Amino acid sequence: VTIPAGWQIDIGLEIHAQLNTQSKIFSGASTLFGQSPNSQACAIDLGMPGVLPSVNAEVFKKAVQFGLSIGAMINQESRFDRKNYFYPDLPKGYQITQMDHPIVLGGEITIQTSNGTEKIIRVTRAHLEEDAGKSIHDFKPGYTGIDLNRAGTPLLEIVSEPDIKNAEEAVAYAKAIHQLLTYLEVCDGNMAEGSLRFDANISVRRQDAEALGTRSEIKNLNSFRFLEQAIHFETERQISVLDAGGTLIQDTRLFDPDRHETRSMRSKETATDYRYFPEPDLLPVMLTAEFIEEIQAQLPELPGKRAQRYQTAHELSASDAALLSQDRRLGDYFDEVLTFSSNAKSAANWVRGDLLSKLNEHELGITACPISPKHLGEMIQ
């Protein structure tokens, strides 16, 4: 979709990544997906009188892993706040999140644009918070129920600067975040199960305007395709309103993929509407330099550096290097093949060609591959 002449778009994404811990962020309840409604919500998740939250240390490790991998600053003093609002799936009447002291500050993600060039998208912050429950509509005709299994599930909310200029860049950025999170194994990235959700903040302005336009936030997009479509339709809506001499209001919207439109849910809230204040039941969490350094030392070789190594050390093409480094387990398998074969190009052809084709045919991942790296490497050699 071409942006009309004389207009420019500014997009910032908020990505909600469910951290793949076995228990919730402030309680010992299980995070296992697909269980019967309300079977995994304990008294802490429900906010019952007299209960106190306690922090799951694993969420800090995973958040620091992500922050270090994007070159961010890790906030050694991490605090939690209450975000107050009413919604049926929020039994406490507030969400525990991080407002003033997020665990991750800054950082950047490099994406490939449609014309083949690289572009840096700045990350503003990433903070820890708890998820809410969810509504189940028409479980009985005319009724809506509440399932609180998801309440208290740990989330890492990753907020970008408005550096994204079109829907294609937004999808490229979202895919890069998805790849990194799954590569680090801090999130399973399963969008069908709600493990990764996108909120898109979109505004348009005249080409010669310096100030950002009035933005709308489109909530809870759960696929790359819906993200792209929602941005296209919202951009068209905003430009048509302004072209007709109308005025835009800052609001929160939902995307209807069947009607190909975005619809207003409510006027956009500001921070004062949520009445943030420090969470009185949780002390500040102090991360030592040793803790951060230990995580840094344990970080795997990241996809970009791995692809670069494949190109320089093994003379693979950029496309082969990117494919073999996009999945951590696939890259590990290929590296092990190379310990038994000195012919990297032939090994790459076998792995990305026949091997992956057969695995896909039988719906198997690389970790379930019946052919060992040693066997394949020795055969190639």
At which residue positions do the language-model features occur?
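Short acidic, Gly/Pro-enriched loop/turn segments at secondary-structure junctions
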Residues: 21-29, 134-137, 208-211
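Hydrophobic (often cysteine-bearing) scaffold residues that line and stabilize catalytic clefts
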Residues: 55-60, 95-101, 170-173, 227, ...
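N-terminal, positively charged regions that mediate nucleic acid binding
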Residues: 1-78, 83-85, 143, 164, ...
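Charged, compositionally biased, marginally structured helical/coil segments
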Residues: 2-10, 48-50, 146-163, 168-381
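Short acidic, glycine-rich loop/turn motifs
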Residues: 19, 110-118, 204-208
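SsDNA-processing nucleotidyl-transfer enzymes
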Residues: 65, 69-151
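Short, surface-exposed linear segments at secondary-structure transitions and domain or protein termini
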Residues: 36-38, 130-135, 222-230
